[in-house]
Regions:
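A short acidic, Gly/Pro-enriched loop at the edge of an enzyme's catalytic core
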Residues: 67-76
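Glycine-rich phosphate-binding loop and adjacent beta-alpha segment
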Residues: 84-152, 190-192
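Redox-cofactor binding/interface segments in oxidoreductases and associated redox assembly factors
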Residues: 77-78, 104
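Short conserved AdoMet
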Residues: 34-35, 97-98, 182
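C-terminal hydrophobic helical "lid"/dimerization subdomain
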Residues: 65, 90, 134-192
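Mid-domain Rossmann-like dinucleotide-binding core that forms the NAD(H)/NADP(H) cofactor-binding site
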Residues: 1-66
Length: 192
């Protein structure tokens, strides 16, 4: 839905979020839109999670990065959601070049404060996205023929399924998922 993901003077794209939404966004930007590793930057809070991105993106911990001093990023995808949305959005505002675009993809139930002064001074554009268009869906289906993209997406698939025979099995699976917030998806196999 973006006309320009990059520009000649701002060739880089950044993603905030080392979870599954950030991973899906990063793989799509690399394998579908052709953003190379040097120009695809992923920021996260957990080094172990960032390691999954290192085959196709440059990674940085948010705690160790000077967002105000960096230049060259035209588009930022905020994929953190939850309590981290506010800091990620404001770090994105600090990072992004003038006339840049910030896409909000992370979901939070709370209102977040943003640095509107810098949004106005830089002339930034914000948009929200949680659904794909027909054209994007068609691009995705075509991209699935790429074996490297398939392999990258397999990183989200868990090794085991939860076998659900009754409501106590379902409760156990949900409690376990909530207690261990890894970024792989939870698969439930119902035997009802």
């Amino acid at each position: 839905q973006l006309d320009e993901i990059t520009t000649e003077t701002s060739p880089q794209v950044a993603i905030f979020g080392d979870g599954p939404v950030g991973y899906l966004a990063a793989t799509a930007l690399h394998y579908i839109y052709g953003i190379d590793k040097a120009n695809l930057i992923v920021f996260g809070a957990v080094q172990e999670k960032l390691a999954a991105f290192e085959d196709f993106a440059t990674t940085h911990l948010v705690f160790d990065f000077d967002f105000n001093q960096y230049r060259g990023v035209h588009t930022v995808f905020e994929c953190t959601g939850g309590k981290f949305s506010e800091s990620a959005i404001n770090q994105a505002i600090d990072l992004i070049d003038r006339q840049g675009h910030i896409v909000l993809m992370g979901v939070t139930e709370e209102r977040v404060g943003i640095n509107t002064r810098d949004v106005l001074e830089k002339g930034l554009t914000f948009s929200g996205s949680s659904r794909s268009t027909k054209r994007e869906f068609e691009q995705l289906i075509h991209a699935f023929s790429n074996k490297q993209y398939q392999q990258a997406l397999r990183q989200l698939i868990p090794e085991a399924y939860y076998h659900i025979h009754d409501t106590s099995d379902l409760k156990e699976a949900m409690d376990d998922t909530a207690a261990h917030k890894g970024w792989k998806k939870t698969y439930l196999q119902y035997h009802w």
